[in-house]
Amino acid sequence: MFMQTKIFAFAGKGGVGKTSLSAAFVRILSESFPDKRILAVDADPAIGLSMALQMQPSLTLDDIRVQITENIERGKTTEAIELLSEARFHLLDSVVEKDNISFLAIGRPEAAGCYCKVNAYLKRVVETLCENYDFVVI
């Protein structure tokens, strides 16, 4: 039977326990459904979920976004197909896996203010990756 990806998002003001709830929920899903694939996404610039799950990414989504933007500005990447290929390649490098859990972090954008660009990129990444997972926890 086909199971559509279930997406869970924990949101709220700072300090209300989003990271703790997300980590506990990911662990419960992992233990309850060991045959299912789980994508845990840390959308908090503080990167607390990586510590809670003990999964350290070597590359974050913002690192990828910045690298691709720099390549465009330098003229290294110009074609849409090159951009898509480069983004997918780096995206695979940014996912950390342990047991049935895959982990992805948004990172900490260097620019002050709005997180709009990296959040828009995160949305696209989750849309792209979610078909490979049974559960996505953000």
For each of these PLM feature ranges, what is it?
Residues G15-K18, M51, E110:
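Short, flexible micro-motifs
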Residues A80-I138:
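Phosphate-binding/switch loop-helix module in NTP-utilizing enzymes
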Residues M1-T5:
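Phosphate-binding P-loop
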